[in-house]
UniProtKB/Swiss-Prot annotation:
Residue numbers binding (6S)-5,6,7,8-tetrahydrofolate: 120-122
Top-level taxonomic group: Archaea
Major localisation: cytoplasm
Source organism of the structure: Pyrobaculum calidifontis (strain DSM 21063 / JCM 11548 / VA1)
Pfam families referenced in this protein's UniProt entry, alphabetically: SHMT (PF00464)
GO MF term list: glycine hydroxymethyltransferase activity; pyridoxal phosphate binding
Gene: glyA
Phylogenetic lineage: Archaea, Thermoproteota, Thermoprotei, Thermoproteales, Thermoproteaceae
Protein name as catalogued: Serine hydroxymethyltransferase
């Protein structure tokens, strides 16, 4: 007999699953869904195991199969990213960042990064992990007209301040950053360049976004669950030498992790193979959809930023909603209509707590099979809420609309036949 308190919690989980999977338009730019096959194999015995150390050199016994899967995952990521070294043990993008900072920035050193209002992630800032590591920060200049790093101004700052590490990439990321140009400057002052690819990893793997390592970055850090639609986790990929890579390995373990949440390896590997097969089509559709949504919002009288530049070249759309009460108010109103976005600071904001913007990502709804026509419908739903229509009225239409898009695309299904094929090939059904 299952205790009542467990049933109550399970009821909450089931309500959440129905709401987010079948009834809402999910536009959080940092989320996605796995394929049915990846989800099934996300549950495995690895989830209760430890494998401290590195492949072939563990501090625990019973890890021979963990080594096989981790080695396969490392090999595939290295091939796809063109990296000499890959570490998949970080459990998140932030942990990947912290380990890299710790390994490459000396005590008392500094990094140059974008402020949060210009797209920098909290882990790039002096209110996040850099503060905990006592690493000083230098602000990279921002070119508001081009919605990107100001290369000329950055050259002056970098040559003057001479940071040990320059961080590109971010959490509000509409256009590729000038990696080649910044890498050239960094080389002249002896600094490393790290590209935080968390938001665009799937676009990189899909071939629609520049590969940072090929553009001159020394290190890629990333999560594995945004435009790359795998389980939550992190990775580090570099083209550095053995000494630097060894320092990164030591920073991952024992400094920042002990357990690597091993169960995610299998689902991450499945997702990586899916992206090799279907990733270009998926990533291309994601970028098309983001641009289509931005254009449709503009036609509805809403104000996406960077119109002169074509709004976006990633999965994201940033919208100035200051005339509707700001990002905090608008995000809450849209949630009442079952449209899920997040408030987000824009470059001209003074507060990240009460920002003027919202951030939208189309990668999950694209994963459910939506295209440009559906983006136009979503823009209409958003505009109805912003014009003052009762969110409950819009919500009814959103739920009805979403019923047509509940099957995950661009990945492997998990029918009985597929599962039997997998196990039969492993001689486990005999």
């Amino acid at each position: 007999m299952i205790p009542r308190e467990i049933k109550e919690v399970l009821d909450v989980v089931l309500r959440h699953n129905r709401w987010r999977r079948w009834e809402t338009i999910n536009l959080i730019a940092s989320e996605n869904v796995m394929s049915p096959l990846a989800e099934i194999f996300y549950i495995n015995d690895f989830g209760g195991r430890y494998a401290e150390g590195t492949i072939g050199s563990r501090y625990y016994q019973g890890t021979k199969y963990v080594d096989v899967v981790e080695e396969a995952l490392v090999k595939e990521f290295a091939e796809v990213l063109g990296a000499k070294f890959v570490d998949v043990r970080p459990i998140s993008g932030t942990v990947a960042n912290l380990a890299t900072y710790f390994a490459l920035v000396p005590e008392g050193g500094s990094v140059a990064s974008l402020p949060i209002r210009c797209g920098g992630h909290i882990s790039h800032s002096n209110v996040g992990g850099l503060k905990a590591l006592r690493i000083k920060t230098v602000e990279l200049p921002w070119d508001l007209e081009n919605f990107n790093v100001d290369v000329d101004a950055a050259r002056k700052v970098l040559e003057d301040k001479r940071p040990n590490l320059v961080i590109l990439g971010g959490s509000l990321y509409l256009f590729p950053h000038p990696i080649k140009e910044v890498a050239e400057i960094a080389k002249g002052i002896g600094a490393y360049v790290l590209h935080d690819s968390a938001h665009v990893l799937g676009l990189i793997v899909g071939g629609v976004f520049p590969n940072p390592l090929r553009e001159g970055a020394d290190v890629i850090t990333s999560s594995t669950h945004k435009t790359f639609p795998g389980p939550q986790g992190g990775l580090i990929a570099t083209n550095l030498g053995d000494d630097a890579n060894g320092q990164i390995q030591k920073a991952v373990f024992p400094t920042f992790t002990s357990n690597y949440h091993l169960h995610r390896y299998v689902a991450t590997y499945i997702t990586l193979v899916e992206m090799k097969l279907f990733g270009h089509e998926y990533a291309s559709r994601v970028v098309e959809n983001a641009k289509a949504l931005a254009e449709a919002l503009a036609e509805e009288g809403v104000t996406p930023v960077a119109e002169r530049l074509g709004f976006t070249k990633t999965h994201q759309v940033a919208v100035d909603v200051s005339k509707y009460g700001g990002g905090d108010k608008v995000a809450a109103l849209l949630e009442e209509a079952n449209i899920i976005v997040n408030k987000n600071a824009l470059p001209w904001d003074r507060s990240v707590v009460k920002p003027s913007g919202i951030r939208i990502g189309v990668q999950e709804m694209t994963r459910f099979g939506m295209g440009k026509d559906e983006m136009r419908e979503i823009a209409k739903f958003i505009a109805r809420v912003l014009r003052g229509e009762d969110p409950a009225s819009v919500r009814r239409d959103v739920v009805d609309f979403r019923r047509g898009f509940v099957e995950v695309k661009y990945g492997f299904k998990a029918s009985r036949e597929v599962i039997e094929e997998v196990f039969a090939s492993l001689n486990l059904l005999a």
